[in-house]
Design a protein with these regions (language model features):
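Intrinsically disordered, low-complexity peptide-like regions
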Residues: 4, 19, 74-76
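Bacterial N-terminal signal peptides
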Residues: 11-19
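Bacterial N-terminal signal peptides that target proteins for export
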Residues: 1-10
Length: 337
């Protein structure tokens, strides 16, 4: 992308889950704090393998499904997704980014949930990865429309991929994994301003509990590398019957900024739109006001359709000033009206 150098699929996929081989071990692996990131990643690999991502490049036909029909929590409403589960060769994975005129990124997620690599420039890549298998997340921006975003995903050279045809779903009790996810997500929802760190590798984890919270509430996010990677933060749970606003200075991230509402389980909600810097209306002084449930005439209003919610701020190609902020500038400015 030279200019950016500086629910149908899933429904049918669920029926395929039973046909996916469980890993050779006959013993179910108990979930612990120590292996939670692996278990939650295995759950996501399972969901995407059910759609065929270990055998082919899966392109979502439109914006993500709402609710738990989505394969992954906190999918965003600003990009379309393409995905593949691949196997490393000599501890490296190979892929490429075509030349496009929209935001286009690839993230390499290890079996421990780490986004070890995140690249945004077109070209061919052969990059190291710490696990045998890796999940490739392609994000194609919708700033030029959904059809254009989908067409650009169609330009991906799938012959680059060493598809993980031998991948076997790990033998966790996924109902138990879900219980851990719910417990951790409730903890995140109780915090006023939860910021993600997304360490790139296992050795970079300095706070296991923080890392588990990040995997439960926002699996698959990217590390906050200035002007390349992203930074994310979650609000606390907010009431549908209250009008909230946040007025803030434009973060001036390299690619774009977005604000997305989710239900208490961190899934997208029916008929609830997101707001991003490609579409928002600025105030006369250059600041930005985003509103929640304040009426159709409110500035940049997000109507959660009568549902309590949390919201996530995303900074794509994050500005160093946002990286260095003690709190997210959008969430910290929220006020009930």
């Amino acid at each position: 992308m030279k200019t950016l150098r500086n629910s149908t699929l899933l429904t049918s996929a669920i029926s395929l889950l039973a046909s996916i081989n469980i890993a050779a071990s006959e013993t179910t692996i108990p979930v612990t704090a120590e292996n939670f990131s692996h278990a939650e990643t295995a759950r996501n690999y399972r969901n995407w393998a059910a759609q065929g991502a270990n055998k082919g490049f899966v392109i979502m036909p439109g914006l993500p499904p709402r609710g738990k029909a989505a394969a992954t929590v906190q999918m965003n409403d600003d990009t379309l997704y393409g995905s593949a589960i691949v196997e490393a060769v000599d501890c490296k994975v190979t892929f490429s980014i075509p030349e496009t005129d929209n935001y286009f990124a690839v993230q390499v997620v290890t079996e421990r949930g780490h986004g070890q690599q995140y690249v945004v420039e077109d070209g061919a890549y052969n990059l190291p990865v710490e696990s045998q298998y890796a999940f490739l997340i392609y994000r194609s921006g919708t700033e030029n429309g959904i059809d254009a975003a989908k067409a650009n995903l169609g330009k991906v050279d799938v012959t680059d991929f060493n598809f993980a045809t031998s991948y076997q779903v790990q033998p966790y009790d996924y109902d138990e994994v879900e219980k851990w996810v719910k417990k951790y997500t409730q903890e995140v929802n109780s915090m006023d301003n939860f910021t993600y760190t997304f360490p790139r590798t296992s050795k970079d984890v300095t706070d296991l509990h923080q890392w588990n919270l990040e995997n439960a509430a926002g699996w698959g996010g990217a590390s906050p590398e200035a002007f390349v990677g992203n930074k994310y933060a979650n609000s606390s749970k907010m009431k549908a019957g209250t009008c909230y606003t946040s007025t803030f200075n434009d973060p001036e991230n390299k690619f774009f900024t977005s604000i997305t509402a989710y239900d208490s389980d961190k899934y997208l909600m029916e008929d609830v739109r997101s707001i991003n810097s490609h579409m928002w209306d600025k105030n006369s002084d250059g600041t930005v006001t985003v509103s929640f449930n304040c009426g159709e005439n409110a500035k940049n209003n997000i109507d959660t359709q009568g549902n309590d919610f949390t919201f996530t701020s995303r900074h794509y190609g994050v500005n160093p000033t946002v990286i260095n902020s003690a709190e997210d500038p959008i969430i910290s400015a929220v006020k009930a009206q």
